[in-house]
């Protein structure tokens, strides 16, 4: 994680302590702050033990190491998330509880091959998962294709894969350089595209 954090800080500056928020900027109307990247403070490890009990398994070793340092991460204006062990009262910048998200994501609905998968994050239409019965890899499941599209030995490898792409998609002010043109013409998109 240190290598990833150093890479982000080299482009946007240091993380500032709050819930560990990173490089805030005003939207054009100046009425709200936005955060490009957020690292959430770790929670008591007893919460991790409760999550293990809920899923009836250990967690992938690289996830355990991550959760000892952080209670989730939000990167690139929520484009990529690693869920937290528990939620908090932070409102918009909530780490998303891994247990609640697994109920919502329902990875098992995509086929029997995912029966032992636990979802721990996402990017776009892809869910990040580990297999409760085999810790060799962390998996990326494309929910549109309903299949595993990538596998990584560690969380650091998985995050590096996505950060390599996403870091160049945002300028030094945190503005997305290439927004989804399919949103053009939608009333809400016309208002918000200037902030993407």
What positions do the PLM features span?
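A C-terminal-region feature
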Residues: 1-49, 69-196
